[in-house]
């Protein structure tokens, strides 16, 4: 451990003790060295004992800085790791930090583009429009056409900080199984690895640019969602240039009502956008918190969302989409047996899982929820309860499902904030039923044939030759099998004779030994000779 890492570790320990987070460690896990170490640091008392544990954890992460704040935000989506009260507190973490100097941002952009800023942009505002832990945003206009744009710039000093803190997180993750009784099941190293991947993705703005381009193409000319245009010629790994948008923050309910927005339609469109991304496109915006969503000023009675910050996206493969849709439909119908079977068929839980026990566990958790009116049931929390129950049956953590569940909670919470009477189930069920019908009906078959048509048109001229080669290969294989069967039969016959002769030879040799022991003079010699000859004959059959 380097001196800087040691200093950082000491700071982390001091902050954790100042907020009383040693309470997270059960007394039975506090070994003698830990007790001695804690007593040596007697002056580092819990200075926030009047606050609940979840709030203290949130405040400690805020004190440690942006890297730990983002880590806490990610942990808030992993509700299998913490009690609900702690997870709810972690969800309150805000990724807001003071902006760095605009002159430094200018130098960073010029270094990335390889020239003075005025070569490409006019009216660059050195005052940041928005600032977060990884990057900040400045406004400008394109010199070539005068279009208003925003420039997102990675913080110049963030990478070494991230690398140092992530290394420490890995070290701390190694302690978790020793300190917490359920530490191994929580797989702390995998949690840190998942977070590291998310951070690295966010540090590469070319990846975010590609994600935004894909989402924009998926919703081209859609009345539901608008993604700003990316200007790829000016994008680099540490700089992103895209169209500047104007809209009402989706969390500003008063402003939305003031412009007479159709709140019911807006809430329903949020649900439709989510399910369209997941099931039609297999590519969904996985960071849809209110800070990244706006509503267009235009056509408030036909409202349109505007999405920004596409650094984190998720995707599902075809099998996952099908199983997830069938799971949702089974939930709508309260068919818990079907839900249990789908989890096994999909490979999400081990194949030897007891279906009856799994079905009973799902029913126990979910049935009380469905006794409520539909507009009071949280789709996201049903999914959360299902995944937590499945983990008791050794369900492997599915990163794509964790992202999906987090996004669904965002979408549902946002929809209920806009329109409290939102019935997400009624909105989603027809969409899912139509999607499943499209996957198994005649249109799906025709689409599959059309997709494979170029491949088969290329292979069709080769088909007679391939068929002839296959028949010849089958004939040669059959001949080889016949020869092998014949040889095995002969070998089996020879081995049978050999075993027979070995048995006779062994019997004669044993008889000779017994006669020698009872002092009969002549017979043993003859038996030894005969037994030896027969044994040698049997040995020759084995060759």
Curated annotation (Swiss-Prot):
One GO term describing the cellular component: plasma membrane
CDD domains given in the database record: UbiB
Compartment list: Cell inner membrane
Residue span(s) of domain Protein kinase: 123-501
Main location: membrane
Keywords: ATP-binding, Cell inner membrane, Cell membrane, Kinase, Membrane, Nucleotide-binding, Transferase, Transmembrane, Transmembrane helix, Ubiquinone biosynthesis
Active site location: 287
Pathway assigned in UniProt: Cofactor biosynthesis; ubiquinone biosynthesis [regulation]
Transmembrane segments: 517-537
UniProt-annotated binding residues for ATP: 129-137, 152
Listed EC numbers: 2.7.-.-
Alphabetical GO biological process terms: regulation of ubiquinone biosynthetic process; ubiquinone biosynthetic process
Highest taxon of source: Bacteria
Topology of this chain in the membrane: Single-pass membrane protein
Single GO molecular function: protein kinase activity
NCBIfam families noted in UniProt: PRK04750.1, UbiB
Sequence similarity: Belongs to the ABC1 family. UbiB subfamily.
Name by which UniProt lists this protein: Probable protein kinase UbiB
């Amino acid at each position: 451990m380097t001196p800087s890492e040691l200093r950082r570790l000491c700071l982390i320990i001091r902050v954790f003790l100042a907020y009383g987070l040693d309470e997270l460690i059960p007394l039975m896990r506090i070994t003698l060295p830990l007790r001695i170490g804690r007593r040596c640091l007697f002056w580092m008392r819990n200075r926030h004992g009047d606050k609940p544990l979840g709030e203290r954890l949130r405040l400690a992460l805020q004190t440690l800085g942006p890297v730990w704040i983002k880590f806490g935000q990610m942990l808030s989506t992993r509700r299998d790791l913490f009690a609900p009260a702690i997870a709810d507190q972690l969800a309150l973490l805000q990724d807001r930090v003071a902006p760095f100097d605009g002159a430094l941002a200018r130098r960073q952009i010029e270094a990335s583009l390889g020239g003075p800023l005025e070569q490409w942009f006019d009216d660059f505002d050195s005052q940041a429009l928005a600032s977060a832990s990884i990057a900040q945003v400045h406004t400008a206009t394109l010199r070539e056409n005068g279009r208003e744009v925003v420039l997102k710039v990675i913080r110049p000093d963030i990478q070494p900080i991230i690398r140092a803190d992530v290394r420490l997180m890995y070290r701390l993750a190694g302690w978790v199984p020793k300190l917490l009784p359920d530490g191994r099941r929580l797989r702390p190293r995998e949690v840190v690895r998942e977070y590291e991947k998310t951070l690295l993705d966010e540090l590469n703005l070319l990846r975010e640019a590609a994600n935004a381009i894909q989402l924009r193409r998926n919703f081209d000319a859609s009345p539901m969602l608008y993604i700003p245009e990316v200007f790829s010629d000016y994008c680099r790994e540490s700089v992103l240039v895209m169209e500047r948008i104007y809209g009402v923050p989706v969390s500003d309910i008063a402003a939305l009502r003031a412009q007479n927005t159709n709140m019911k339609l807006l809430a329903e469109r949020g649900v439709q956008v989510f399910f369209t991304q997941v099931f039609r496109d297999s590519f969904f915006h996985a960071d849809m918190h209110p800070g990244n969503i706006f509503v267009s000023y235009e056509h408030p009675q036909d409202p349109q969302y505007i999405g920004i910050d596409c650094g984190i996206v998720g995707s599902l493969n075809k099998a996952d989409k099908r199983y997830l849709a069938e799971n949702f439909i089974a939930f709508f119908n309260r068919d818990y047996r079907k839900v249990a079977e789908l989890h096994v068929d999909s490979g999400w839980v081990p194949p030897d899982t007891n279906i009856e026990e799994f079905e009973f566990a799902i029913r126990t958790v979910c049935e009380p929820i469905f006794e409520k009116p539909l507009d009071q049931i949280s789709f996201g929390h049903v999914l959360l309860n299902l995944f937590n129950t499945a983990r008791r049956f050794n369900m492997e953590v599915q990163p794509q499902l964790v992202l999906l569940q987090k996004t669904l909670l965002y979408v549902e919470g946002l929809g209920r904030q806009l329109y409290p009477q939102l019935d997400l189930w009624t909105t989603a069920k027809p969409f899912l039923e139509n999607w499943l019908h499209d996957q198994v009906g005649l249109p799906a078959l025709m689409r599959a044939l059309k997709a494979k048509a170029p491949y088969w048109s290329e292979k069709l001229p080769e088909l007679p030759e391939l068929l002839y080669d296959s028949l010849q290969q089958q004939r040669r294989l059959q001949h080889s099998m016949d020869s092998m069967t014949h040889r095995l039969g002969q070998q089996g016959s020879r081995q049978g004779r050999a075993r027979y002769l070995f048995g006779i030879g062994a019997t004669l040799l044993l008889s000779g030994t017994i006669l020698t022991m009872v002092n009969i003079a002549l017979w043993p010699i003859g038996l030894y000779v005969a037994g030896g000859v027969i044994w040698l004959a049997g040995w020759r059959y084995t060759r």
